């Protein structure tokens, strides 16, 4: 099975991540730096995936070399984009990046972002509505 066939699982991951961020108090309308993770044991293949991610409109970080607990060495990079927490756009990004991962036989390992705290007034306003 290729990774693209697992896209429904990634769509669920995308929604769960958005929900968790918002439930924890992150801003709903903020621009987020979304970092999609790729990995491979073959640097040359990973580099080709990075070129395709760049061509698809993502910023690409320099590849890093990591040693796993079992002693295996892997290489990884992030494909980065600024996005609102828009499920349709995140799902479209996942589709594009899963296809790139399959094309180059590298691992797509999901995405992460940074918490964007709400402004102080937003909490007070929310409390006020809860007490009405």
From Swiss-Prot:
It comes from the Bacteria. SUPFAM superfamilies: Hypothetical protein VC0424. Pfam families: RraB. Its main location: cytoplasm. Belongs to the RraB family. Interacts with the C-terminal region of Rne. This is Regulator of ribonuclease activity B.
